[in-house]
Structure formats: structure tokens, C-alpha cells
Amino acid sequence: MNSTSSQTVNLVADIGGTNIRLAICHADNSIEKIETYQCANYSSLLEVIQYYIAQQSLKDKSINACLAIACPVDTGFISMTNLPWQFSQKELKQQLGLNSLSLINAYTAIAMAIPLLNDQQKVKIGQGEAITNKPIAVCGPGTGLGVANLIPVNDQWHCISGEGGHIDFAAVDELDIEILQYLKTLKKRVSFEQVLSGYGLEQIYQALVHINQAKKAQS
């Protein structure tokens, strides 16, 4: 993003299906004025950003914005996966009076931040040691399931983002199969996102309750 001055502001946002986080980013990558809002309390992304701009007294500033969004962003028209929000990149820029507006996939943003982490910001899981300058897989459950890959090319990192959470859930044992069979009574197609996410935990719980009740009834 462009560097900040007294009249220029870099606005950044992390937009998920449950929460939206807005902040001001400076040229040294430091951020301030971080605010979190619940998406369900607003009718549109425009409404949330307008509120933040008013609260932070930014109306008279020249604003460059970069929004990380939990859905595909390559068409210029955004239809969020886990939220009933739709908008045009061009129209949003005009409505907010922005100097510039960039949209990136939320897991592209997360993946590109991985090389910036220091050892104190990392937690080791499992055995073995990390190999430097090798591809990095990024995966995280939230409202949905986000995935991305980070590939080193010519001393730079390139991100390959996708919608991996939408691939079919593959059952591997008897309990998995029982859970899958229950979830298929709710939806014709069951993706990994439906078991590995915030609402996925709820669905697994519901499935286990159903399975246990059915077994008790048969005993």
C-alpha cells in the first residue's frame, strides 16, 4: 500500500463470515486503531466501513484501502460465501470516496504474513523440523474453512489461494461414515467446511447426539 502522510491513510480490513476487523496500517507495517465488529449487526460492508471512517474522523483524509475477504475476489463483484453481502469493487470505491481499493482473499493475506513471523510467534506441533524455503500449507477453520499455499519463487513468496474447504468430506472410518450419513440428511453434498469450521463443530455435535440416540433406541 502507499505510504501514509498527515492527509493519507491506509485502511486495512479482515472480513470473515462472523467478524470484520478494521485498522490503520502505517508504512513501517505497524497498525493501530483496531476495531472489531460483528457482521450480523450490519446490512452491508459499506455500512461497517462508513461507521469506522466516521468513528476515526477519516472523512477528510485520502484513503487507500486493502480488504482481505473470505471468498473469491478475482471478478470485481463480491458475493460472500458465509454472509449475505454482495458488492462491486468499483461501486464500493466510489461510495466510500477512496483513493484506491484493493481486494485480496483472506487466506492470501494470512499466507503472505507467515514469512514475517518470528520464532516467538510460532508454536511447534508434532515432530520434525521445518525446512526453510519450501512450500508452506496454510489452513484454518473459522466461520468456514480457509486454505492457501505459499510457494517460494526466485527469492520471493507467491500465494496460491483457493476454496479447499469446499471439497467433498471423505469419511475414513465407521464413525466418519455415520456422521456423513447424518449430514447428508441435512444437505445433499457434504464438504470439509461442514465438519471443520465453527458451524462444523455444531454439526458434528448434532450428528453424535443423533448417532448415540439411535444406538440407545436399538439396544
Go through each PLM region and give its residues.
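Short coil/turn connectors at secondary-structure junctions
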Residues: Q7-T8, L98-N99, T132-I136
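Short glycine-rich, Thr/Ser-proximal phosphate-binding strand/loop in the N-terminal lobe
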Residues: N2-Y51, S161-H166
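Short beta-strand scaffold segments in enzyme catalytic cores
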Residues: I20-I24, C71, V138-C139, L145-I151
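Short beta-strand-loop/turn "lid" adjacent to the catalytic site in phosphate-handling enzymes
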Residues: L58-T108, M112-Q121, V138
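Residue-level signal for inorganic ion chemistry
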Residues: L22, L92, L201
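Glycine/GP-enriched mid-protein hinge/lid loop-to-helix segment characteristic of carbohydrate kinases
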Residues: Q127-A137, L145-S219
